[in-house]
Amino acid sequence: MSVARITTVNFNTKEDCDTMVENYVANAVSEFPEAKQLLQVRTSDTSVVAISLYADNEAMERASAARDKRLGASHHQHESLDTKTGEVKLNHSSNN
């Protein structure tokens, strides 16, 4: 079964969040090539939840350097950051 990393970031300003969202949309696919699925959800003007699915823990760990680089570059813009990981129990996608 695959694993997920769920990261919630609260930014200091709407503009900081806007910049990060635009950058993630433009670059995440190339930065995290082993990710089976990448989702980003804007939950408020200053908050984002990113969900990354990987085949296994090893693949997720190999992505850690790119994740650390991305988050480190914008750390001064974060009000708070929370990360959780776990085994995916359901991954349903509908073509509707």
Write out the residue ranges for each language-model feature.
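Short S/T/G/P-rich N-terminal loop/turn motif that feeds into the first structured element of a domain
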Residues: M1-K69, H76-N96
